[in-house]
Amino acid sequence: MLEKQDHADAFFARSANKLDFGNWGEKEKVALSCRILASEGHSETLAGQITVRKEDGTFLTTPLAQAFDEIDPASVIRINEDMEVLEGPGTPNPAVRFHFWVYRQRPDVQCIIHTHPPHVSTLSMTGQPLVVAHMDATPFHNDCAHLKEWPGLPIADQEGEIISAALGD
């Protein structure tokens, strides 16, 4: 008999790469992700960002002060770890700095989507641990990092150290 994790691993292996994006480029995929997030109520401008790790060591990201429903492929910018814009209009959100720490800690991570869904934000303010109470949440069971203390805006290296350490392997 297979263990539960073995079943989960097998399912995700079979499901990987089943979506056909045709000839869509990375910027188009970022823009589509933003539109999907916006359609689900994630209308971030300052407190949410997406980054994608590129093979050349640079990153695609959404610019500061643009809501997810405003992002199109032309507004996606390419940056380096020094937050310098290498391609595209706009300024990177300083909060993406913590993404670099995660990418260094976890070579398997290729994309980070950081949002503040209203319901999740509300639940987090209760100070109570979240409980897996529905079968749709079971893939996250024992695979979530929880931070008891938070130093504030994630714009410095301290936040990246805390987050990447909490994620572990």
Give residue spans per PLM region.
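Glycine-rich flexible loops
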Residues: M1-D169
